[in-house]
Structure formats: C-alpha cells, structure tokens
Amino acid sequence: MLYHLIRPLLFRLDAERAHDVVTAMFRATSRMPLLPRLISALYAWDDPALMVEWAGLRFASPLGVAAGFDKRADLVDALALLGFSHVEVGTVTPRPQPGNPGPRLFRLPEDMALINRLGFNSHGMVAVAKALRARRSRRVIVGVNIGKNRDTPLERAVEDYAATFVALAPLADYVAVNISSPNTPGLRRLHERAALEELLRELMRLNHGLLYPRPIALKISPDETLDQIEEVVRAGCEAGVAAFIATNTTLAREGLRSRLANETGGLSGRPLAPRARQVIRAIYRLTRGTPPVIGVGGVLTADDAYAHIRAGARLVQLYTGMVYAGPAIAREIKRGLAQLLRRDGFVSVTQATGVDAEWEGAIRQRG
C-alpha cells in the first residue's frame, strides 16, 4: 500500500535515478538497528509447499531476484528481508566498466515493461567479491551472473568469463553464465555451438578444480529460434550445465503501446511473458526437468509465476515486477502461489512443474 503512494514520485524521476534511490533506501534500512527484524516481520512469508531443491541447494520458495537489480552485490541482505529465496547478482565483468551512456533505462507503464540498454555496467569482480564477503545474511541463496567486458574481443571472451568465475564462484552458491544480453555487441554469438562448447568446457574445467564445485546455469536469449535453442540446450547438457535460465530480455517489440517502445535495448516485463513461457516449455520438453529451468520474464503476479512453473520452471525470478509492485511483491506472489497450488491439488511446486508442457506434449503425440 505504501509503495503505491510513493511510486508516482519515483516515476517522476529518470528510471535509473529512481532505481538508485530505492536501492539506497534498501541498503540503509537493512543496516539500521531493529529495522531488519521489523521489515522481515512485514514481508517474510513462507509455506512448506513452496520449498524447492536444486543441485543440493534448498530454496525456501521458487521466487528470486533476477540479475540486473543488484549489480554490486550489496543488496543481498535487504532482498533477503523482503522474502526472496535467492538473489542473482550482476552481471559482473572482470574489470569495472561504466556501460552505455544514459539515458539507458526506460519505464513503459502502459505495457508494464522496461527497456534497458545498460550494457553490463559493472563495478568489476574485485568490488563484487568484497561485497559478497561482507554480506550478513546466509539464509538467502546467492548466484553470481558473469559476463565479458565490452572491449574484450569475442575470441578472448573465454578469458573474461574464466577470470570472473575464479574470483567469484567460491563466494557464491551458483554461477550464471550470461551469453544473451542484447546490449553487449556480439555477445549472442556465444550461442553458436563451437563458441559455446569452448566456453563451457573451460568453465567446467575450472569448476572441477574447486574444493566445492558450484552449479553452473546458462542464461539464454528469447530471440533465438526454437531449433537454435535446442542446439544450445543440447550443448549445455553435454557440457554438464546444472540449469538453463530462460530468458534474458528481448529485442522484439510486438504489441507495445508506449511511446518509448522503439527505444534501443532489451525489453522485460509483461510483454516478454508469452515468449519466455514458450522457451521454458521447449527446454522442459527437451530435458524433462533435468537439468531444470529457471524461468524469468514477465513475472508480476502469482498467476505469472504459476504459469512459468506449469510451463516447466522449477525456480522463477523477477526484476521488472519490483519496479511496478514494490517491495511487497515477494510476499504477495508467494501467498498467491501457495493458494494456486492447493486449488489445483498440488502439494509442492515440484509436483506442478512442467504439467502444462507434459499435457501439451501428450496432445501433440495423440494428434
């Protein structure tokens, strides 16, 4: 309720400036005496039916924060207080870089969407490593999303991913490999089989050298064809990827009403949801949930999260939803999700995962 009073004021600011204001508030309140306990009492809500396991990690619920919201890894404690089960920080590059010039983040309220062309603005792996060591909360699972520096030639991209992996994997619960941002020139060429195999082979080699190897997830683009996505999934499975994150932002613009619809960058939010679910279903049908899918794109309500789960996602993440619904979004989605599961006779998220993909597959086979 309070956020809906504040939101009109925030929406008068440039979108990136508003994000900075909100995250500064999050950062401050999580460090004040007594306030964290009060915030947790207001926003934390869990239900045993929502518990999910993946790669030896236990998630209190399937709902997490997607990469992009906390690029510096200094909001983990605050986001844990709001009731998210996991936070994916980043994208993190080896060296600090400013990203693209502003303005570079745009709200599309008519479409419940955002367009960003941030361009991997990053404080670099050294600063993020320091922030991860300083975090207080250990009850939230932390993933690190890694990418390459803009000025690194594509033929040397593996070196960037490897350096960031070595620096940050020991400090994280899992690592997400971002090959799909539309805002770094040439990055999506890493979806090509030979380049992807080289990248994953090196990361797996480094991972096997860790005392405790980390699950590695691969974040993919929604703008590839289903045949191309199948090729990426097969390469990932052969390499030993532990999950696929579907999807990143899209370059598509169909059906948008906002006057800002033609801004350059990746589109997120409600318009992405149908395509994200299509990709989630496609991956689930290929893998049968092993490795699982982490669903991202257009999650603003419990119904959205539930649709992703039924399409095949074991975990779901959001970012744009926080902009429009505010800090109570995790609590509201989890409450609604528990009700939806019980309404349909499911005792757990796992039981509901992929039921729509399986049903549609069965229909096609009979047809």
From Swiss-Prot:
Keywords: Cell membrane, Flavoprotein, FMN, Membrane, Oxidoreductase, Pyrimidine biosynthesis
Binding site for FMN: A67, G68, F69, D70, K71, T91, N145, N178, K219, T247, G269, G298, Y319, T320
Enzyme class, UniProt record, top EC level: oxidoreductase
Single GO molecular function: dihydroorotate dehydrogenase (quinone) activity
InterPro entries: Aldolase_TIM, DHO_dehydrogenase, Dihydroorotate_DH_2, Dihydroorotate_DH_cat, Dihydroorotate_DH_CS
Enzymatic reactions: (S)-dihydroorotate + a quinone = orotate + a quinol
An annotated GO cellular component: plasma membrane
Subcellular location: Cell membrane
Leader sequence residues: none
The protein's required cofactors: FMN
Pathway: Pyrimidine metabolism; UMP biosynthesis via de novo pathway; orotate from (S)-dihydroorotate (quinone route): step 1/1
Cell membrane listed as a keyword: yes
EC number annotated for this UniProt entry: 1.3.5.2
GO biological process, one term: 'de novo' pyrimidine nucleobase biosynthetic process
Subunit organization: Monomer.
HAMAP family xref list: DHO_dh_type2
Protein purpose: Catalyzes the conversion of dihydroorotate to orotate with quinone as electron acceptor.
Family in the record: Belongs to the dihydroorotate dehydrogenase family. Type 2 subfamily.
Protein name as annotated: Dihydroorotate dehydrogenase (quinone)
Organism, as annotated: Roseiflexus castenholzii (strain DSM 13941 / HLO8)
Gene behind this protein: pyrD
